[in-house]
Amino acid sequence: NRINKKQKYMDINLYEWLIEPFAEFDFMRYALASVVFLALSAAPVGVFLVMRRMSLVGDALGHAVLPGAAVGYMIGGLSLPAVSAGGFVAGMVMALLAGLVSRFTDLKEDANFAAFYLTSLAIGVLLVSMGGSNIDLLHLLFGSILAVDLPALTLVASVASTTIVTLAVIYRPLLLESIDPLFLRAVNGKGGLWHLIFLVLVVMNLVAGFQALGTLMAVGLMMIPAITARLWVRNMGMLMLLSVIFALLCGLAGLLFSYHVEIPSGPAI
């Protein structure tokens, strides 16, 4: 009897910790679905960032999204279309500016990204601080699972679908450009096009992830699973698969930890 009671107690605890949050609350189900979609799309993008030695560029673009999201917030509050559009425009503007500066100066692209992302982060924090509360600033920076509703989930699903299809179409030239960009440009001269499309995918995934993860932490679900998978495998297909699995596990564990401990979801994930 004592063993049965102990087993029953453990079963109840496991249910309360692992299943009840998703069974009882819509926002947790939305957040879980959002993390699943992000893992399927952002993790493969992160693999290409690692392969192309652009890990810090992903971080820089994550910071660059903030001022655009802040402007969207000042115009429309926490309206999803306003904040998402502002973040996407800001991310693309910074990516293009960094590329132009590196082309017309002696500075390399990663150095330009470092300068631009520090500036954009400072501007974004100032804008949100001027126009909102500390709660709004924490939401934009570190995410909130309470903010993941059906429209946010629809945005994430759309971005994930677009990313997966686009990566499937441009996989070969993107992989070749990651390994030998000079050869690709000599063969078809479209290396810059694939690079631009890839940057668009990076910014799209960062914008899609900001509701649950925040602008500062969205890049984490993109980079950390890819970096961890790189320690275990070298094959590109296995690298993508393992990074997606790591992202799914971290996303699930982070959501549960965020819910039970009552902390922002972005850092927890």
Language-model regions, residue ranges each:
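Generic alpha-helical transmembrane segments of integral inner-membrane proteins
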Residues: V36, L40, P44, V89-L97, ...
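Transmembrane alpha-helical segments in multi-pass inner-membrane proteins
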Residues: L216-P267
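Transmembrane helix-bundle core of multi-pass membrane transporters
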Residues: L14-P21, M28, N112-R172
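Short juxtamembrane and helix-loop transition motifs at transmembrane-helix boundaries
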Residues: W17-D26, A43-R52, G72-A82, P173-R185, ...
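Structural signature of hydrophobic alpha-helical transmembrane segments
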Residues: M28-A39, L80-V93, A157-S158, V207-L221, ...
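Membrane-interfacial amphipathic/re-entrant helices at transmembrane-helix boundaries
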Residues: R2-L40
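Short loop segments and helix-boundary regions at transmembrane helix junctions
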Residues: V47-G62, L66-S133, A229-L241, S258-V261
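Helix-loop-helix "hairpin" substructures at the membrane interface of multi-pass membrane proteins
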Residues: L153-M222
